[in-house]
Amino acid sequence: MDVVLEVTDQFMFDYMYAWLLPARPALYDFPDKTNGTAQAFSSWVYEPATKFFSLEPSQAAYQSIWTRDNIYRQALSLFLILWLFGLVTYYVFASLSYIFVFDKKTMEHPKFLKNQVWLEIKQTNAALPVMAFFTFPFLVAEVRGYSLLYDTTAEGPGRWYDFFQFPLFIMFTDFGIYWIHRGLHHPLVYKHLHKPHHKWIMPTPYASHAFHPIDGFAQSIPYHIFPFIFPLQKMAYVGLFVFINFWTIMIHDGEYYANNPVINGAACHSVHHFAFNYNYGQFTTLWDRLGGSYREPDGDMFAKEKKMSTTTWKKQVNEMEKIVKEVEGEDDRLYEPTETKKSK
């Protein structure tokens, strides 16, 4: 994450901290840009976060009492990156998925909630800053050199590992999330933490990050501990971070492209949302198969006409209502009236 921090420092945070916490109280005390003495204000020396590119700092990088290597500045910056950039990513890509991928006919489903899209967005807005608060200490530890992140192949285990790190990351995090997710379904935990995410029986892409914040943070822990246990290339880390967010949106978009026996895609995750106690995995079906919690999606889910048919919906509703009674007791969800759905 030091690469991301360097980029955001260069284009945003240097100017923000120079304005909020200036090294000198008055603007006229700043040295002229042409004399190159701005560095006299600070003992901090620029070192690129990666050998693949460098961004020569502007004068603003030296004009705050909180230099780039200040731990308090790093903590605040990383918190803001997680929260605000996470929010931007969520709105942009969940919206694109909602507009171009999500089948709006899903909103006619008997278990689609009243004002569901806005409720999903509201839940996400409330959750993201709290999730960011619990997450930023991991990133601070990373940028301060306590992780096993590496830059070039020569600094890592070798060329073979540059490729092996990707399946290793998927398998490790999938295993961790499986058990955390399954634990969140324990009766002593479910109603307090995981129930808010299961409010969405027929989720939209906006449900992707609509968690109780502790639930969302708990399921992200495997991602954040991985680089403290295994080596991980810095650029691969950033790419995987982006991929995780995309994947989370994709498995909530309701578009079932393929009935793959290995990949835990949108169809498998949709089964989890209406049948609750199956398909806890994030990326693959492996751990569900080994843990006895795998349920193959019905073939009808991959035929659009059948997927959206009254017969299929009725079958899902009957099963869902039975399971909700067992897991939650009374169903306190507020569903959209059928007449209203038909008029849309």
Swiss-Prot record:
It is found in: Endoplasmic reticulum membrane. Its EC number is 1.14.19.20. The chain crosses the membrane at residues 76-96, 123-143, 160-180, 224-244. GO terms for cellular component: endoplasmic reticulum lumen; endoplasmic reticulum membrane; membrane. A motif (Histidine box-3) lies at residues 269-273. GO terms for biological process: ergosterol biosynthetic process; sterol biosynthetic process. Pathway: Steroid metabolism; ergosterol biosynthesis; ergosterol from zymosterol: step 3/5. It catalyses: a Delta(7)-sterol + 2 Fe(II)-[cytochrome b5] + O2 + 2 H(+) = a Delta(5),Delta(7)-sterol + 2 Fe(III)-[cytochrome b5] + 2 H2O. A motif (Histidine box-1) lies at residues 181-185. The keyword Oxidoreductase applies. A motif (Histidine box-2) lies at residues 194-198. Its cofactor is Fe cation. It is a multi-pass membrane protein. The keyword Membrane applies. Keywords: Endoplasmic reticulum, Iron, Lipid biosynthesis, Lipid metabolism, Membrane, Oxidoreductase, Steroid biosynthesis, Steroid metabolism, Sterol biosynthesis, Sterol metabolism, Transmembrane, Transmembrane helix. Residues 167-292 form the Fatty acid hydroxylase domain. GO terms for molecular function: C-5 sterol desaturase activity; delta7-sterol 5(6)-desaturase activity; iron ion binding. The histidine box domains may contain the active site and/or be involved in metal ion binding. May contribute to the regulation of ergosterol biosynthesis. Belongs to the sterol desaturase family. This is Probable Delta(7)-sterol 5(6)-desaturase. It comes from Neurospora crassa (strain ATCC 24698 / 74-OR23-1A / CBS 708.71 / DSM 1257 / FGSC 987).
